[in-house]
Amino acid sequence: EAASDNGFTVDIVGFNEELEKQKNRARNARSNEQSMNIQNEEYLNFKRKSEFVGYTTLEQESTVIGLFKDGKKVNKANGLLFVVLEKTPFYAEMGGQAGDQGIFTYKGQNFDVLDTFKLPNGQHAHSVDFKNQEISVDDIVLACVNTDYRLAVSQNHSATHLLNQALREVLGQHVVQHGSQVTKENLRFDFNHYQNLTVEEILKVEKIVLDAIKKGYEVKTIETSLENAKKLGAQALFGEKYGDVVRLVDM
């Protein structure tokens, strides 16, 4: 009725089709999460603590505290493994941002870290192809993050925040982030709006983002309480879990 009163028509069929697609995507996402968190008890039962140090260093010598192969916890193995370290500089996939890549140096050889993700209890797991080299729990590796990869991903992550602000300026404060995907190559930003953006609106958004990039704003990082972060204007992403202390990035 509101649309009709303002001279608009609503494509009910199209809306229902898109709604069903979104429901399917949500179901698939929940299914993938359940396969990690529920179906694999090996991951669920792994409780050893692992510390993330990747905000202060991108290189760390560390002890292997967990090994998984084909979903099973093992004491030693070769080939494609999920490796958990006592301390790691590798950022795990979270909030739509891709996990770090890089290398592990072990017994004088370099092995590719293909991806980094979180296990159910919060430890960062590294997907590493050790090929024919066997590695054991309690062995020591040198973990080195690919700095170019981290920089490219972090730049695209910063761009999502600039885009969020630009959209709110152009379209209105009703715009809320509903998700994102941030990789080395590009970014995707999901948000709500009443209709498709016009060419004029898109150009305005692009200009605001590009102008902000050209100004080269200083990026400041602080750790504060979740409550204080919200008072400072931080926007919590729906569906994300936050601790009592959060890392607040200001540009």
Question: What is each residue range found by the language model?
Answer:
Residues E1-M251:
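A glycine- and charged-residue-rich anion-binding loop/surface
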